[in-house]
Amino acid sequence: MASITQAAKSLLLKEFASAFALSMRQFFAPKATLNYPHEKGPVSPRFRGEHALRRYPNGEERCIACKLCEAICPAQAITIEAGPRRNDGTRRTVRYDIDMVKCIYCGFCQEACPVDAIVEGPNFEFATETREELYYDKDKLLANGDRWEREIARNIAMDAPYR
């Protein structure tokens, strides 16, 4: 009986018909791809892209030179040099470098920072022509923070209930 059923299936091309029907359904379904350079999909608030150093609303940089991000970085991509203590007892960085070639975008630096100074922003389009352009210094990181501050603040606020 099973052999008769199998012969009927192959004679009537049941598998072919079901596969063809599936192909036709997928052919006329809406496309799932985006035309990337011209269309961009949504980015999660937790997306880890290009690094940035943030400032307070009064313009002062947030980094207090605690060096927690440097200590926790598994790739040892962060180098910080702290300046002398100021009159109010706080410190600021003299040098803050990130080697983006070494960085593995794990987000540990962002999680370790007690003042949300170093963040990974929403920018994922930072391809360069030379390797040297991927060595970010403090000025480059602060410029990134200034450029993306609105989006970074929105993403941190959206993620705040889960921290």
From Swiss-Prot:
One of its GO terms (molecular function) is NADH:ubiquinone reductase (non-electrogenic) activity. InterPro entries: 4Fe4S_Fe-S-bd, 4Fe4S_Fe_S_CS, NADH_quinone_OxRdtase_chainI. One of its GO terms (biological process) is aerobic respiration. [4Fe-4S] cluster 2 binds at residues 73, 103, 106, 109. It is found in: Cell inner membrane. Keywords: 4Fe-4S, Cell inner membrane, Cell membrane, Iron, Iron-sulfur, Membrane, Metal-binding, NAD, Quinone, Repeat, Translocase, Ubiquinone. The keyword Magnesium does not apply. It is a peripheral membrane protein. Binds 2 [4Fe-4S] clusters per subunit. Residues 53-83, 94-123 form the 4Fe-4S ferredoxin-type domain. NDH-1 is composed of 14 different subunits. Subunits NuoA, H, J, K, L, M, N constitute the membrane sector of the complex. HAMAP family: NDH1_NuoI. Belongs to the complex I 23 kDa subunit family. This is NADH-quinone oxidoreductase subunit I. The lineage of its organism: Bacteria, Pseudomonadati, Pseudomonadota, Alphaproteobacteria, Hyphomicrobiales.
